[in-house]
A protein has these predicted regions:
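Flexible, acidic/Gly-rich N-terminal and inter-domain linker regions that tether
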Residues: 1-60, 69, 109
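Divalent metal-dependent hydrolysis catalytic cores, especially in the metallo-beta-lactamase
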Residues: 60, 73, 150
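Short beta-strand motif preference
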Residues: 61-63, 177
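Short glycine/serine/threonine-enriched helix-capping/active-site loop
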Residues: 63, 216, 247, 299, ...
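Local cysteine-cluster metal-coordination motifs and their immediate loop/turn environment
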Residues: 63-79
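Short, solvent-exposed loop/turn segments at secondary-structure junctions
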Residues: 69, 252, 330-331
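Conserved non-cysteine loop/helix-boundary elements of the Radical SAM core domain that shape
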Residues: 79-287
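A C-terminal junction/extension of Radical SAM enzymes
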Residues: 259-331
């Protein structure tokens, strides 16, 4: 492959930005952040559950599945890699008990969700039978007949043809594949469980059986990432022609394997690309997708056809929908 030099984006006005990637970077998904919650606020939480919902506000449901084949070295979510089928069934039972409690509250009871999101962890780690048990229980408590979108995160190595068919039959409309990169060495050194061949197989069959939307995730600036490998990954992603692509920049929060190694070695700077490089690589990716006809719709997302491809979960989150989150460490 011929060498390509990625031009830097224009420098922002104002004070210089931090260049090195250090530990402790994280995003705030809710406000105020959990770290600022106080014991004396619990009565306010219960009071909110006992109020009738505001008229016209849609309801969304986030369900956390915290199981994985292995923990990625950069992962900062609550995950388990050592649970057997009996322990997983116990977790699913508890999930439905939690949803039962919420479904009995005035703010939730009688409402039908507009969008549902299965995140993790790895939701596709569950077997088809486990998934059916969970979703049947959820539908009995909060019917899905008015749902516009069901998003389901999947790790390519767990997505057999049989499981993909089962996921589609459950009503999933938006499959989000955690690809992250197409280079097997990059995947291995960063602790990913899947490899590039599994990406191609899972993606092709997901297309064949007609998922309405397929999103793929990429991460810029992973451990041992190079400009050449990033260019190749972007080219392969464009060639797949997914409905949307979410592009993250590598971060190293404190509860990651990378940080533990940094701490043991007394290092302050993470062994990943610096912020300037990551911004440049993301800018390059956006440019390549735009050349292929995609539209940038957020700071992390490009979409093939904005008139057709909607991300109802994100739109609801940004516009003030009620979102009920269930499961360990859900948000």
């Amino acid at each position: 492959m011929s060498s390509i030099t990625i031009a830097p984006p224009p420098k922002p006005a104002g004070p210089p930005l931090q260049k090195e990637t250090t530990a402790g970077n994280y995003f705030i998904s809710n406000y105020p952040p959990f770290a600022f919650w106080k014991q004396e606020q619990i009565p306010d939480f219960h009071a909110a559950l006992d109020r009738a919902p505001a008229p016209g506000v849609p309801l969304g449901l986030y369900t956390h599945i915290p199981f994985c084949r292995k923990r990625c070295h950069f992962c900062y979510y609550k995950v388990y890699t050592d649970k057997d089928s009996q322990e997983i069934r116990g977790y699913l039972d508890t999930l439905l008990k939690e949803l039962t409690v919420y479904a009995a509250k005035p703010v939730i009871g009688g409402r039908k969700p507009k969008f549902i999101y299965f995140g993790g962890g790895t939701p596709s780690y569950l077997s088809p039978d486990q998934l059916k048990f969970l979703t049947d229980g959820m539908k009995a408590l909060l019917p899905w007949d008015e749902v516009e979108e069901v998003t389901f995160e999947g790790e390519p190595g767990t997505l057999t043809d049989h499981k993909l068919r089962a996921i589609r039959e459950l009503g999933v409309t938006r499959l989000s594949l955690g690809i992250e990169h197409f280079d097997d060495h990059i995947l291995e050194i960063n602790g990913r469980a899947h490899r590039s061949k599994e990406i191609g197989r899972a993606y092709a069959y997901a297309r064949e059986i007609g998922f309405p939307q397929i999103n793929i995730d990429l991460i810029a600036g992973m451990v041992e990432e190079t400009e050449e490998k990033w260019v190749e990954t972007v080219a392969k992603a464009v060639a797949l022609q997914p409905d949307s692509v979410t592009i993250y920049q590598m971060e190293v929060p404190y509860n990651t394997g990378i940080y533990r190694q940094m701490k043991a070695e007394g290092k302050l700077v993470a062994p990943v690309a610096d912020w300037e490089t990551k911004r440049r690589w993301v800018n390059y990716a956006y440019g390549e997708f735009e050349k292929a006809g995609y539209t940038v719709t957020s700071t992390t997302t490009v979409v093939k056809d904005p008139a057709k491809v909607k991300f109802t979960y994100r739109s609801g989150l940004f516009s003030g929908a009620d979102i009920l989150s269930i499961g360990v460490a859900s948000f």
